[in-house]
Amino acid sequence: MAAQHKRAAEVGAAVLEAGGDALDAAVATSFAIGVVEPWMSGLAAGGCMQIWRAGEARAHTVDYGMRSPRGLDPADYPLAQGGKAQDLFAWPLVKDDRNVQGATAVAVPGVVAGMELAHKRFGRVAWRELVAPAAALAREGMLLDWYAGLMIASNARALSRDPDAAALFLEDGQWPPLISWTAVTEKHLDQRKLSHTLETIAKEGPKALYGGDVGRALAKDIRDKGGSLSLEDLAGYQAHMVDALEVPYRGGRVFAAPGMTGGPTLAVALNNLQKKERPGYVDYARALDAAWRERFQTMGDKEGCTTHFSVVDRAGNLCSVTQTLLSVFGSRVVSPSTGIPLNNGIMWFDPEPGKPNSLAPGKRCLGNYCPVVGETPKGARFALGASGGRKILGTVLQLSSFMIDHGASLEEAFHRPRIDMSGEGRVIADRALPREVIDELNRFLPTATVRRGIFPYAFAVPAGVLREREMNMGCTEIMSPWGDAVAEKEMR
């Protein structure tokens, strides 16, 4: 089990050790990661899951992306005079950042419905047992170590604007938690309300959120703060399971999500790479540049701040899961009744009217998440994905190519230098690349070099697993202070 937080990975690995399926482990990890990494995902998230069923030799996609509330009025998001938004991407500025921050930015979440749909189809372990570990983690409260302090401090000003977010994440409602440089920290977030919410969802099932008491309290909190999400929006939400988008690639295969995700754009990029025998970094940049151009012309341009985890079980079933609140800390709003940090999915829409992706009521969001499962020419199967908004696509492309085209192991692929080409007319390259590669990239597009670091991330943050000759392995971003892969035997 490979995830962006070891505690969440341990939850999934424990499910595997107890005899659960990869899908069971994915569901348990989905709930757990929202507790221990609350700025990335949680019960208010949306996302997508790729599933490989070894017995069927077939890939499935579960799409649980967000939707705009049906009662949303685009007139409530007037454009400000001049300027561009300062968050994840340069939309025209909306008055008071109503599409970015606050309850007006909250979209209908889908992650709980997505987990329910996948669990009903493939799960073996009881729903309550899969949600219970997350409730226990929330009862304990997320440990406030140096990295948590860094993430909260970097968003403290925005969090302070919502009294409930400030009460949860900030000391005295205004200061980021101060972590001692030398002492072992014993500080924890007070997530008892979230724990109670998770206990209710464990006992009553997803209906508690989608039409029940949890949903009723959540919708009231959002409306009391000025948002438009209603209980009817929650009750009417549906996740969808469809066949995955299959991309044959040089003797191997990559399965991605169709529709309003990064999957179709990844397929374009992979098909562009087919023309090169052993593609290099300039080939990656060219393939990504062409794919982004097509995406911008046909689908729009979106970003996000997400989390990703991947799992493989002893039978060879794989799951690759990406879920997100969109921005870091989402809308920077917390529901006081439920303890749920809320998304800002409305920012996924273009605030200018008359565009293909313009803001409208009851509309699906277009995301960049791109979880995949794949197969190398030698028959090894992998599941991987990443967090990082636009950076996700290039990372998934390169990691897949490293393994399929260059025969790299999972560990080797994750340690190799990468580039980022996110459709902005420039390339960001790892400074560890040879000078001649940098020069060649510069001849194609202006290229800046950066050192791979902990914060901020210049590249996406991947997590992946691989099964080869009945041996399972996992790996996470090498610079991540929290990410880790955990084997089920470690939980014995």
What are these regions (language model features)?
Residues 1-10, 14, 22-204, 209-211, ...:
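Noncatalytic scaffold domains of N-terminal-nucleophile
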Residues 281, 301, 315-317, 363, ...:
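Extended C-terminal subregions enriched in glycine
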Residues 41-53, 307-312, 371-373, 459-467, ...:
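Short beta-strand scaffold segments in enzyme catalytic cores
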Residues 36-39, 46-68, 85, 228-230, ...:
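Active-site rim segments in enzyme catalytic domains, especially the processed small/beta chain
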Residues 255-263, 310, 322-333, 366, ...:
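Glycine-rich phosphate/pyrophosphate-binding beta-alpha loops
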Residues 241, 303-306, 367-369:
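Short, small/polar residue-rich loop motifs at catalytic or cofactor-binding pockets
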Residues 164, 270-325, 334-338, 344-345, ...:
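Internal maturation/activation junctions in enzymes
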